[in-house]
């Protein structure tokens, strides 16, 4: 991940629910009220790159002893809800992460870093481990000829199962699958040349 990584840019553009903790004049256009203020306790969805800054930067510094209250409070998004976490714990491999969010792992890492959520970190680590094993299985089951299975015989079922599995992957997993598959193909080519 980095400044020029398009997936990181797209992940940072994902909108997260926020609650404003101040009345802010002139920002009414964010809720389709140009020229009006945003009032305290207004809930809006903001892109993560903006919400993260506003959630860290404090507003009014009334007392020296107190920490300044940030402009917004980041609210937990639906992708980290109890319902989704239970689905992950139940069957991490069968879960369609792409339908939850196409940059699930990137956003989970960013959320964990922001809030030091150990429980979420444990769930996401286990999810990645389980899905990585399945990714490896699918990447290794394809031979050099995409119309043949690992025994060299044509197998439409292998390709259909892999295609269905690939549709459920989020972007980081797709990249891992691609690299793993290319590595297996290169290894098989090398072994056949010997």
Curated annotation (Swiss-Prot):
Disulfide bonds: none
GO cellular component: CMG complex; DNA replication preinitiation complex; GINS complex; nuclear replication fork; nucleus
Subcellular location: Nucleus
Principal cellular location given in the protein's record: nucleus
Assigned keywords, A-Z: DNA replication, Nucleus
GO biological process: DNA-templated DNA replication; double-strand break repair via break-induced replication; mitotic DNA replication initiation
Function: Functions as part of the GINS complex which plays an essential role in the initiation of DNA replication by binding to DNA replication origins and facilitating the assembly of the DNA replication machinery.
Quaternary organization: Component of the GINS complex which is a heterotetramer of SLD5, PSF1, PSF2 and PSF3.
Family that this chain belongs to: Belongs to the GINS3/PSF3 family.
Additional remarks: Present with 2205 molecules/cell in log phase SD medium.
Protein name stated in the entry: DNA replication complex GINS protein PSF3
């Amino acid at each position: 991940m980095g400044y020029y990584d398009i997936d990181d840019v797209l992940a940072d553009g994902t909108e997260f629910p926020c609650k404003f903790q101040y009345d802010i004049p002139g920002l009414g256009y964010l809720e389709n009220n140009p020229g009006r203020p945003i009032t305290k306790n207004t809930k809006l969805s903001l892109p993560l790159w903006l919400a993260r800054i506003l959630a860290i930067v404090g507003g009014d510094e009334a007392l020296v002893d107190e920490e300044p209250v940030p402009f917004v409070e980041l609210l937990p998004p639906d992708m980290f809800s109890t319902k989704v976490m239970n689905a992950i714990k139940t069957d991490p491999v069968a879960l369609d992460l792409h339908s939850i969010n196409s940059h699930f792992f990137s956003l989970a890492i960013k959320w964990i870093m922001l809030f030091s959520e150990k429980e979420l970190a444990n769930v996401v680590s286990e999810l990645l481990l389980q899905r990585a094993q399945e990714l490896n299985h699918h990447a290794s089951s394809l031979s050099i000829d995409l119309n043949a299975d690992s025994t060299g015989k044509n197998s439409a079922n292998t390709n259909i199962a892999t295609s269905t599995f690939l549709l459920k992957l989020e972007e980081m997993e797709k990249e891992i699958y691609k690299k793993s598959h290319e590595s297996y193909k290169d290894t098989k080519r090398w072994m056949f040349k010997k």
